[in-house]
Amino acid sequence: MRDPAPSDTQKKRVIVGMSGGVDSSVSAVLLMEQGYEVEGLFMKNWEEDDGTEYCTAMDDLADAQAVCDKIGIKLHTANFAAEYWDNVFEHFLAEYKAGRTPNPDILCNREIKFKAFLDYAMMLGADLIATGHYVRRRDIDGRTELLKGLDPNKDQSYFLHAVGGEQIAKTLFPVGELEKPEVRKIAEKHGLATAKKKDSTGICFIGERRFSDFLKQYLPAQPGEIKTTDGEVIGRHHGLMYHTIGQRQGLGIGGLKDAGEEPWYVLVKDLDNNVLIVGQGNEHPLLFSGALLASEIYWVNPIDLSTPRRLTAKVRYRQGDQPCTLEKTATGYRATFDDPQRAVTPGQSVVFYDGEICLGGGVIEVAEAWSNPA
């Protein structure tokens, strides 16, 4: 059920995080139709230092302003670049330096959109904030739950798993009940400049640059050997940080004599020896894990893990729900899967669900090899 409109005597002030995209634009429209007093806020989270707008921040601000002008609401702007650098980007670099593959969007949601933005909006006198995320919330028994968005192709609960229930309780998600085509229809109906705007993809601060070109600006590359599982050296890599488990493209080791035609995949990143271990075939056994370890989990609301609990999990965005058993260990958490999981990647997030409820998640520390119980 959608959030009810406030009564006339309790007209609530909502500040919408306006990204310059269609989802936040339509969120503002829907809230106005529901009777809220609506304002917008555009966040600048990255400072370009070379004169090139890789993040298209100026274009996005112009689109956000055009939408706010069209629907007749005020647009605030705020610069959270310092907070982003300290709380998101430095962690991003540290993870890559340690050989892991982080997801900065998850940290950005926790530290910027649902912390810095939320605090700033409250300072401006807002009762609530709103975003264009495809998730839903439910208030039940004195707590606020985070639910999957109704559009399975757009559900973004994976990215919001580290946001606490107290923050979710102060947030409205107007498009979480809708499917994307309906959102675009609403934007077209209201003549919004963002109606046909492409969805943003990738990491904002990298933009259109090649990832390797961006990363080498901040971290020195450490070239090393590429080896097969038998220890044969078949090439060289430019740095382990440029590769991730399960990667196929960009290895530069095709056409080897006696190797067969099957493509090569990254199986292991040997950090101690700076070696990339590869193997052939999409179904290579070393690509599959049966369990994973996480040292810390952020729960939307506290849950009881005094005994192992049956849940489902995702180890990547848009993955289907994977049945698993989650248990607390002496050093963290262990999730054991019913079925083998391909390319479980340290540094990425595992997110746990109970049906449509997103319970929380944490960073994958270790992926344990799959051993067939049969």
Curated annotation (Swiss-Prot):
It comes from the Bacteria. The keyword RNA-binding applies. Disulfide bonds join 108-204. GO terms for molecular function: ATP binding; tRNA binding; tRNA-uridine 2-sulfurtransferase activity. Its EC number is 2.8.1.13. It is an enzyme of class 2 (transferase). It catalyses: S-sulfanyl-L-cysteinyl-[protein] + uridine(34) in tRNA + AH2 + ATP = 2-thiouridine(34) in tRNA + L-cysteinyl-[protein] + A + AMP + diphosphate + H(+). Its main location: cytoplasm. Keywords: ATP-binding, Cytoplasm, Disulfide bond, Nucleotide-binding, RNA-binding, Transferase, tRNA processing, tRNA-binding. GO terms for biological process: tRNA wobble position uridine thiolation. InterPro entries: MnmA-like, MnmA-like_C, MnmA-like_central, MnmA-like_central_sf, Rossmann-like_a/b/a_fold. The active site is at residues 108, 204. It is found in: Cytoplasm. GO terms for cellular component: cytoplasm. Pfam families: tRNA_Me_trans, tRNA_Me_trans_C, tRNA_Me_trans_M. Residues 154-156, 316-317 are annotated as: Interaction with tRNA. Belongs to the MnmA/TRMU family. This is tRNA-specific 2-thiouridylase MnmA. It comes from Pseudomonas fluorescens (strain SBW25). The gene is mnmA.
